[in-house]
Every structure is written in structure tokens, then in C-alpha cells.
UniProtKB/Swiss-Prot annotation:
It is found in: Cytoplasm; Nucleus. It comes from Caenorhabditis elegans. Residues 128-136 are annotated as: LID. This is UMP-CMP kinase 2. PANTHER family: NUCLEOTIDE KINASE. Catalyzes the phosphorylation of pyrimidine nucleoside monophosphates at the expense of ATP. Plays an important role in de novo pyrimidine nucleotide biosynthesis. Has preference for UMP and CMP as phosphate acceptors. Disruption phenotype: In contrast to its homolog C29F7.3, does not confer resistance to 5-fluorouracil.
Length: 191
């Protein structure tokens, strides 16, 4: 059974940055749903490439079966990890139900790391980060933030009711945010 930490927050809240530090220091493997989807979109001969491309361009959410399959395959490929950081997933109710159906008995959600950050800071970070992502433009960002507010935030509220959410305010400097994140992991691993 794989240990999983879902890492959620608005676009530009620092999910990738914090996950890289956790992976480097705490022996968790970072699996970005978005990166897996972008890689699959680029993969020669991918049966899902065009479909993924259209969802990414529209700022909409890729069908859950595709994302879960990519996550499951990635976990199998590095099975000896202490746990997995699943970044940017689940993003809506459909994702959550699909995960529960497909990963039941295969993965245990330890907790949800919620990186909260004001939207104005998130948008500014995305526009300045220079990752060359096709969806890091103002129009796509506004759609992504709207999608996050309407669909992803209710998922965080769902996990909150189960007592699984650990919120860290991520508008602060990276080292300060990471120090708080490390405390969350220390507390979770003592249980």
C-alpha cells in the first residue's frame, strides 16, 4: 500500500517548489499530475495526447481515468519510496471519486497539504516564473483560478471534514514555508 500526501493549492501557490524540497529532504517521491499529463501529451504515439492538449488549453480538467492511470503507473515504477506527494490532484469531485474507485486498497492518503496563498500573489508568481508553460498567460490563469475556486476548493473542504487537511500559508519566503511544511510531516510520521 502506497502512502500518499495530496498537495493542493491555487496555481502559483508553490506546490512544485515545496514538493521539490520535500522530495530532496524527506524521501517522498513528487508526482505532479500536471507534469505527468504534459509528458503524456508530448509522448510519441500517445493515445491521449490530443485530448490532454485540448483540456490544458481550455483550462479544464482532464478525465480522471487518464490521470489516475498515469499516477498509478508512476507509483509502481518507484515502489520503494517512503511515500508519494501527489501535486495538483484531486482537482474536483469527479477526480476524488475516480481516485477512490481506482486506488482503493492501493494507496492510503496520509493527509492533504494545503498551500494557501492570495490569488493576486499566485497570478504574479505564475506570470513571472518563466517555465514556458502554454497555460501561464493571464487569460488561462484566470480560467485556472476560477476552476480552482469552483471545483478544487470544495475538495479541500471535503478533506477538512475528515480532519486530513494541514494548511500552510505559502505567500511567505520559501524557507519559512518549508520549515512549517517539515513540521507537518514530522507530526504525521510520529503517529
Amino acid at each position: 500500500m502506497h502512502n500518499v500526501v495530496f498537495v493542493l493549492g491555487p496555481p502559483g501557490s508553490g506546490k512544485g517548489t515545496i514538493c521539490a524540497k520535500i522530495q530532496e529532504n524527506l524521501n517522498y517521491v513528487h508526482l505532479s499530475a500536471g507534469d505527468l499529463l504534459r509528458a503524456e501529451r508530448q509522448r510519441e504515439g500517445s493515445e491521449f495526447g490530443a485530448l490532454i492538449e485540448s483540456h490544458i488549453k481550455n483550462g479544464s480538467i482532464v478525465p480522471v481515468e487518464i490521470t489516475c492511470s498515469l499516477l498509478e503507473n508512476a507509483m509502481k515504477a518507484c515502489g520503494d519510496a517512503k511515500g508519494f506527494l501527489v501535486d495538483g490532484f484531486p482537482r474536483n469531485e469527479d477526480n476524488l471519486q475516480g481516485w477512490n474507485k481506482q486506488m482503493d486498497g492501493k494507496a492510503l492518503v496520509q493527509f492533504v497539504l494545503f498551500l494557501s496563498c492570495p490569488v493576486s500573489i499566485c497570478i504574479e508568481r505564475c506570470l513571472n516564473r518563466g517555465q514556458g508553460r502554454t497555460d501561464d498567460n493571464e487569460e488561462s490563469l484566470k480560467k485556472r483560478v476560477e476552476t480552482y475556486n469552483q471545483q478544487t476548493f470544495p475538495i479541500i473542504e471535503h478533506f477538512e471534514k475528515s480532519g486530513l487537511v494541514r494548511e500552510v500559508k505559502s505567500e511567505r519566503p520559501v524557507d519559512v514555508v518549508y520549515a512549517d511544511v517539515e513540521k507537518v510531516f514530522d507530526a504525521a510520521n510520529k503517529k
